[in-house]
Amino acid sequence: MTSSIHELSDNIGSHEKQEQRDSHFQPPIPSARNYESIVTSLVYSDPGTTNSMAPGQYPYPDPYYRSIFAPPPQPYTGVHLQLMGVQQQGVPLPSDAVEEPVFVNAKQYHGILRRRQSRARLESQNKVIKSRKPYLHESRHLHAIRRPRGCGGRFLNAKKEDEHHEDSSHEEKSNLSAGKSAMAASSGTS
């Protein structure tokens, strides 16, 4: 056991010596011992500290937007944390950032764009209507408010609505019976 540890340490030492000889040909690659310290310094570094890494150059530049005189793209030498199994914390989006529907079909999308363009054109001509109703027909709005909704706020159809009412009535009955049995058990023990 100890001999294998010594062989391993000797092997690492000879590997480091060879790296020092070849250092003028290639940039040094971090060894396995330094791997943990690199990962922890990348993950736990504060944004205001001086040892934080600057973002590297984008590895895949588009040749159409690059100048003729610009230097050719260099290979990306940064550390890919996703490939090492380290998860980065994402920046949470503000809750009011998404004001539009997320899923629309092609016709709806083109209709939305067409309305935005016409509204922008009217605003540029100062002909925009100041007070717009949020909905066109009051009765349709009231009906939509009263309709039961399912997962994601979508309207339920009649078949699913009946199942939804049966499930909720069944749950209420089971909750009532469980509550009565619990009260009977507690009154019987005291």
From Swiss-Prot:
Q: Where is this region: Disordered?
A: 1-33, 147-190
InterPro entries for the chain: NFYA
Biased composition regions of type Low complexity, renumbered to the chain: 177-190
Q: Which residues bind DNA?
A: 133-158
- Report keywords, A-Z: Activator, DNA-binding, Nucleus, Transcription, Transcription regulation
One Gene Ontology term of the biological-process aspect is: negative regulation of DNA-templated transcription
Q: According to the UniProt entry, where does the motif Subunit association domain (SAD) sit in this chain?
A: 103-126
UniProt feature, compositional bias: Basic and acidic residues:
7-24, 158-174
Instruction: Name the job this protein performs.
Output: Stimulates the transcription of various genes by recognizing and binding to a CCAAT motif in promoters.
The entry's protein name is Nuclear transcription factor Y subunit A-7
Report the source organism. Answer: Arabidopsis thaliana
